Amino acid sequence: LGGWIATRAGGHFATGETHIDDLVESVRALTPTGEWQSRRLPGSGAGPSPDRLMIGSEGALGVITEAWMRVRPRPKYKATATIGFDEFSAAATGAVRAIAQARLGASNCRLIDPLEAKTTMAGDGTKALLLLGFESADCPVGTLLDQGVRIAEQHGGKVLSSRVSEPDFEAGDKKGTGGGSQWKDSFLLAPYLRDTFVACGVLSETFETAITWDRFEEFHADVMSTARRVVAEVCGVSPDGEGAPRISCRLTHVYPDGAAPYFTVLAPARRGGEVEQWDEIKAAVSEALIEGGGTITHHHAVGRDHRPWYDLQRPDAFARSLGAVKAELDPAGLLNPGVLVGP
């Protein structure tokens, strides 16, 4: 929990209150100059929030030792559907945007492009897949799913499977077969396969960001193009055809005003040069994210890997202000040197 707060990360809910910011009621931290303790309140408009300053500080300002959190009851009712679309970008700016702006409160609203669907065995690679889901601790959510599906169908979507689960029966009402469960299994396994992939000669890297809807299509196209070109150059392969790098995208979180695209790179590694290859790819794609107007990270935090592009993203006055806070709380620079502020 402390790590989630310190990295200001996002949860698995695709819409609504998913970032840890929304769930923290108060924070206690220890700094080299003393204790940091905010007042426990359900809400406050009293100036800048002390909690928000510590949330996302990544250990550079203090060590979080306690926190009061807003929790939800475990859901009893669930309803899910897998919906196919002919084209990823059009589905994003059409169906997914409309669902987000309808504010239905979907717990899952992940759009997966055809290549990722095929790679994870969630689909055959001919369709983009929207994994749509709702859940509640109090009441059935089938009606919400129906509304979401209706919006998707208005934008060209075709339902491939659906399921409604309630406390009275375990299996629920299930129709058709879809790729939601297959994708989920691959998603949960992916972080543990990274080292295995490299040992087998495959580079694996991800880039996650966020962008407003009005810029999404151009942004997505530019990042995909940059990634294909750079990865092909670095790995010494053709950007197209057999042996080409696999660059895919999905939307992990969606908002009424934008989305969080998540890009995945799979490419042949050069034995002994894997780190250098990774550095070149990381730098080029990160540059494309910032130049396109996106954020360097939506929910993976800054750390040291993203620091050069975080410096470009934030306002200079904010950087100086954050440095002043660091100097006040950690004058000797003991806490996580080089993260967020300082050399």
Outline where the language-model segments fall.
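FAD-binding subdomain of flavoenzyme oxidoreductases
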Residues: 1-110
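Short hydrophobic alpha-helical segments that form membrane-spanning helices or hydrophobic packing faces
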Residues: 10, 65-67, 219-220, 307, ...
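A short, flexible low-complexity segment enriched in Lys/Arg and Gly/Pro that occurs
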Residues: 25-44, 269-280, 304-313
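Acidic/polar loop patches that form or flank catalytic/metal-binding clefts of enzymes
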Residues: 36-37, 106-108, 158-161, 297, ...
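C-terminal substrate-recognition/cap domain of FAD-linked oxidoreductases
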Residues: 73, 79-87, 92-284, 288, ...
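Small/polar glycine-rich anion-binding or flexible loop at a beta-alpha turn
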Residues: 115, 254, 296, 301-308
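Activity-critical C-terminal alpha-helical subdomain
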Residues: 303-343
